[in-house]
Swiss-Prot record:
Disulfide bonds join C27-C120, C31-C116, C40-C126, C52-C95, C55-C73, C56-C91, C62-C104, C119-C137. Belongs to the protease inhibitor I20 (potato type II proteinase inhibitor) family. Residues 1-24 form the signal peptide. Pfam families: Prot_inhib_II (PF02428). Keywords: Disulfide bond, Protease inhibitor, Repeat, Serine protease inhibitor, Signal. Sequence repeats lie at residues 24-81, 88-145, 152-209. The record marks K29, E30, K93, E94, K157, E158 as: Reactive bond for trypsin. This is Proteinase inhibitor type-2 TR8. Induction: By auxin. It comes from Solanum lycopersicum (Tomato). One of its GO terms (molecular function) is serine-type endopeptidase inhibitor activity. It comes from the Eukaryota. InterPro entries: Prot_inh_I20 (IPR003465), Protease_inhibitor_I20 (IPR051391).
Amino acid sequence: MAIYKVALLLLFGMILLASDFEHAKACTKECDTRIDFGICPLLETKRVEGLCTNCCAGKKGCKYFSKDGTYICDGESEWVSEKNNNLKKACTKECDTRIDFGICPLLETKRVEGLCTNCCAGKKGCKYFSKDGTYICDGESEWVSEKDNNLEKDCTKECDTRIDFGICPLLETKRVKGLCTNCCAGKKGCKYFSADGTYICDGESEWVSEGENDLQKSNVAIS
């Protein structure tokens, strides 16, 4: 019986270890010599406690944790209409008992009216709506160089007549210089550039525990 219990404990430990590796992949500590600086969002966050939610119903942009600060998951749902904050997809209303609190971005937004744009040319991070507040789409384009704010991909210049206004994040950014990092170890949300302002890549790593706000994949310094 004792051997059986030990075997179960070992199996449980291996499952937890495998789960940790699933969330994180190894990054080298080498400096990418092309990278000179990064432009990163300067975000405030709020801690939301006493939650009854689950990973599916949790809000996109929020990270959910257990009582001891262990990362559980990222939220998967987002609002689809300015008029009602319903989930985009069907999720159960059951509470995930592992989740104790969430860390969510505290974002200001701006309403942009009188638009002539389309879903392809619309800005990433913006949500576009019809005149009556019905959700149309998320913008798909982002700037690819600090020097010129061109679209990342080829989009038509035609107006999507369904789109009347957009809700866009009002973000502050910070410029981080003197970096020794690489694309894998760079922070998610940051864009990395060469000395002449040419876009190199987006960072790929994010923190997974509130108690330990280090990079998920590496200890390469980014700030």
